[in-house]
């Protein structure tokens, strides 16, 4: 298989974790006889410093010509005083919009060696493996009008929660398609007891469900879903929800694992082109120290192999390699206990690559 992958290192620790993930992908290409062509572009604060724009046209052209995009991180205090249009995060919003990346995927899988890092009890965490599918381009964050105005003689503000049938149908279809490759259960999260947009969402989810008789659909109000994620996260397989609810629930679910340094994510469109990135931020305080944890980015690359390229075996090989490394007690500083010796960004990547090579040798 031949694929072009756009690397967007971005800011802070981004260049370090992207460089290490590229090494893992090169090893996958060698072991499984693929050809990955890597191109690199600027985004975020790095792009602002170099070009004045958080998303230069050159980067957007590279994105449109690539099969998938791997992003490091954007942002940092250096650019906090910039105007909104000149903030690093604007580049990420712009590339999502330009590529029509409407589906955000946030897998939450609790790894046995790191159960102690979570604030939840181990019996609650055992076998947690869920996927949150969040609608990314509609809803309250994008609806118009959005404005300040005078209301009955005092300051007021208006935001608009707007969804169309097409926006709801396509994200719900995505959720059902992902569920078919998992445990075949979808929970649609809404606020249908209060919001008209949620009542439409629920009606359309029921209609879409009839096209997937092999998948079970249930509905849950968002306040109950927030509680159930903590009470019993094992009950969930695929959660699908609108933008605001998904933003909140995915951050809540991320803490089930106990470490942001292990959480990958993806933003995808209908054609399976995706932008893959770690959930964590740019961590400028440790940039250049060799202490960054690359595992979330490496696992994001595994998502890319599975969801954009259809390479399920290769994706699984990376996940198994990461699991093996953690089971061996190899840790970067962010996930190491006080009594454990932390290793560098490069060292933990080397361990992942060694685990990949061992798995490949054993399967011959």
Swiss-Prot record:
UniProt keyword terms in alphabetical order: Amino-acid biosynthesis, Branched-chain amino acid biosynthesis, Cytoplasm, Leucine biosynthesis, Magnesium, Manganese, Metal-binding, NAD, Oxidoreductase
Domain of life, per lineage: Bacteria
Gene Ontology MF: a single term: NAD binding
Cofactor field: Mg(2+); Mn(2+)
Main location: cytoplasm
Entry-linked PROSITE patterns: IDH_IMDH
UniProt record, GO biological process: L-leucine biosynthetic process
Pfam families according to UniProt: Iso_dh
Keyword rRNA-binding: no
Annotated localization: Cytoplasm
Catalysis: reaction(s): (2R,3S)-3-isopropylmalate + NAD(+) = 4-methyl-2-oxopentanoate + CO2 + NADH
Keyword Metal-binding: yes
NCBIfam families per UniProt: leuB
Subunit relationships: Homodimer.
Protein family according to the UniProt entry: Belongs to the isocitrate and isopropylmalate dehydrogenases family. LeuB type 1 subfamily.
Protein name (database record): 3-isopropylmalate dehydrogenase
Organism encoding this protein: Shouchella clausii (strain KSM-K16) (Alkalihalobacillus clausii)
